[in-house]
Amino acid sequence: VGNFPCCPFLRTGIVISLVPLLNPLHAQLRISEVCTSNHTVLENTVGDHPDWVELHNAGTDPVDLTGYTLSNYHSDPAPWHLPQESLAPGEFIVFMAGNSDQHPHWFGFDLGRSGETLFLRDPSGALVNMLEVPALHPDNSFGVAPDGALRYFGTPTPGAANTTEAYLGYAPTPVFSRSAGSAAAGTEVHITAGSGTTIHISTNGRDPDTSSTVYGWPVTLHHTLVLKAIAVGPGLLPSAVSSATYLVNEPTTLPIVSLSTHPDTLFHPELGLYMVGPNADPNYPHWGANFWSERHVPVRFEYFDEHRVRRVDQVVDLKIHGGRVSRNQPQRPLRLTARKRHGADLIEYPFFPEKPWLQRFKRLVLRNSGADFLNGQIRDQLFHQVALRNGLDIDVLGYRPVVVFINGEYWGLMEMRERIDEDHLAFNHGVDPDSVLIMEEENFPIQGDSIHFHELQHYIRTHDMDDPVHYAHVDSLLDIHSLIDYFALEMFAGNVDWTSNNLKYWKPSLGTGKWRYLMYDLDATMHLYDWIPIDLDAFYWVLVHRAGFIHSEIFRSLLGNTRFRRDFLNRLADLMNTCLSEEGFAHEIARMRQLTDAEMPRHFSRWWGDIGTWEQHQAIIAEFAAIR
């Protein structure tokens, strides 16, 4: 309908009463249109597309909105109060969901896409109007047609009369004769919908519309594909999209992720998010390339467990993830984000065996192994698994190897991982995501004010850490026990892309908890490059080669404390005699390789890699385990 960036609400200049009322002044004010899944119809001043509610003064007298309330609960003790202004006869006004403290025309609650009931009350608390809003598809609305009937609208009209084509509802959703998952070549899939409807299908990933192929006969499966279908009928809006990935003669024993979307959103030569595009700098890392964009595109995300049972099926937002090395690989890392506007604001499934308590995620990452891509394909996740499976006091990321398909095309082996952010910390530690402080590298803020860690690191670097009083003060603010495990593992790994890089740390809030490090991106470890010796002196690397960087200097200062120095060296020795011993480390490597080795030839072939390179890196990693 339009974009209204200049103001977060609309007013313009005929609704039949939905609930008969005695007071004619009240009776003329009505909820005339509602959108519970706004993707593109209306934009607020900060670039968001929130839910919205339209009111209409259908009478001949002005209505003073002062004291009126809007709520989605029948007995709401704290309903939202409309602004103190008047609505002229025939005038419409649109209110948007949002933080009501930020603007008087933003109501402080969200609308349920699966259905909602709205209550409009006058200053005395009497019910003026109630509207039961059914489940709505994206960018559809529900409201009052010119004849007074309640109808669905495929083209909403916020701030104006609902004069676009009105519909009775949605066509029934098509039903497939076969569930998503494994299928043999030659299998037929039948599709049915309600009588009098026409079914349209697609097999290239895009959501079908009325221009898509008309279904007239069973779909025969010859190869892995994503089958999607909608139904249309007279007087009805198109149905919801039915979607199923059929994994035809798929040999892998790993879980499978299927992503599907309109091919152009990812692969259009000029516009596709996955592509280099027309504006890329020709020099590495190709700033300006499409894959550097922060843009999100909607994709259908299906997750199949190792038994080919579909455990997740929802639409999420996708963007390219990662830093310079990762984004410039031909297999790019992907970030998946659940959004309420797509029907669910969380992804719910226990993806990570070593973190069984984690069953809800705001974001997931499909990682390509970064600098270890088409090399060892194991380095980073190996150390996270060592930490998790051996109880190290480090904040690490869950890991699950998955085979990925995009629009039915094999996309290779990827790592399903958690995304480090405030939601990740909330789900792992039970902290308030709005209060948590997260910094990275040289005290650059991700969330919260950096002054607090700045003061801590300055104190550490300017005070004698062997003084018990000084050390106790630091111990009250910094989780030293966790720091010891974190530095011990990073230094054993021989990580040369650290401490000046790949470093994040957090605390629950300004007034509570201690700072802790978050471990991630250990790709440049275990002799990845020829110039990194297996017997790398990690103390020299941290204290001399990385001298001057904040976290190297924190470590140097703490080593000045007799107790810390003893605890650190003892802990490092304990780890090297247990999980980091030749036997313990080799056992974990073998366990992880057992999961993924069978997939490597197909993965390397897909990305034009040399499987011989992978074999060389496995030998290097085994040598590292033996002599490090």
Which ranges hold each PLM region?
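Short, compositionally stereotyped local motifs that mark structural "simplifiers"
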Residues: R30, E85-P89, F95, L136-D317
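Activation on beta-sandwich/Ig-like modules and their edge loops
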Residues: A27-F153
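Residue-level detector of buried hydrophobic side-chain packing
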Residues: I31, V53, G90, L118-L120, ...
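Bacterial N-terminal signal peptides
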Residues: R11-L21
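Cysteine-centered motifs
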Residues: C6-C7
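Short, conserved helix/loop micro-motifs enriched in His/Cys and acidic residues
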Residues: P330-T337, A344-Q381, Y459-L477
